[in-house]
């Protein structure tokens, strides 16, 4: 069933904030201490350009099917997870309707890195009958080189000179919410690398460093 002129509203954002966000400052950790690497990490990350303002493009047409509107929302969530710009695609079952209780698997890609999402359709929004609530949970996370750089320079602002990491790719699949194999060290202005680094983690709302 193709539903015309129906928009979607994200209700999973509340869960994302509760489980993945720390108001952008992840220098506060859960007891983990920096780990000595005994050598300077090989990859230098300089300050990235700001994320572009405005809506992610292209956006759905006014008469887009429900599945297209949902795919667009998942593209936005994928960009938030990556914390970076890049080629993003999304695909949901074309016959996916907006009936409450419907479940489906959708797929997004960021620079060719694929993420599958468990999607559950809810009821009509209390704001409008043209808005449909849904939850979308990624099965995997994404880490990006630019996303990690943007996080570190955003957290440490004017105190950071540069960051060193162990070769984070442009984009790579990573487990959600747990320590990944990638690590970074923040080098402060006027200082030299110490050899102490901390792990980088993927979350559904962007990378974290602790």
Residue map of PLM features:
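N-terminal export and membrane-targeting signals
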Residues: 1-11
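C-terminal motif of bacterial Sec signal peptides marking the signal peptidase cleavage site
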Residues: 17-20
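Bacterial signal peptide processing site
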Residues: 22-25
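N-terminal low-complexity, Pro/Thr/Ser-rich intrinsically disordered segments
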Residues: 32-73
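Extracellularly exposed regions in secreted/surface proteins, prominently low-complexity, repeat-rich
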Residues: 33-35, 151-210
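Short, non-transmembrane alpha-helical segments in secretory-pathway proteins
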Residues: 57-89, 141-168
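Serine/threonine-rich, repeat-prone extracellular segments and beta-strand-based repeat modules
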Residues: 86-105, 166-178
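Acidic (E/D-rich), amphipathic helical modules within compact regulatory domains
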Residues: 90-137
């Amino acid at each position: 069933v193709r539903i015309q002129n129906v928009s979607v509203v994200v209700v999973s954002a509340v869960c994302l904030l509760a489980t993945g966000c720390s108001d952008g400052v992840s220098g506060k950790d859960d007891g983990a201490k920096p780990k000595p690497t005994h050598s300077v990490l090989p990859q230098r990350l300089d300050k990235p350009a700001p994320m572009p303002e405005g809506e992610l493009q292209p956006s759905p047409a006014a008469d887009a099917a429900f599945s297209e509107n949902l795919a667009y929302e998942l593209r936005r969530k994928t960009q938030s997870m990556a914390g970076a710009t890049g080629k993003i695609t999304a695909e949901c079952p074309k016959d996916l309707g907006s009936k409450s209780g419907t479940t489906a698997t959708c797929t997004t890609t960021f620079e060719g890195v694929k993420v599958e999402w468990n999607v559950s359709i809810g009821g009509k929004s209390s704001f409008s009958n043209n808005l449909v609530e849904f939850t979308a949970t990624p099965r995997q996370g994404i880490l990006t080189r630019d996303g990690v750089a943007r996080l570190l320079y955003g957290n440490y602002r004017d105190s950071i000179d540069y960051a060193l990491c162990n070769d984070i790719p442009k984009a790579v699949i990573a487990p959600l919410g747990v320590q990944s194999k990638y690590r970074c060290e923040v080098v402060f202005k006027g200082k030299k690398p110490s050899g102490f680094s901390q792990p980088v983690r993927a979350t559904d709302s962007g990378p974290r460093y602790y």
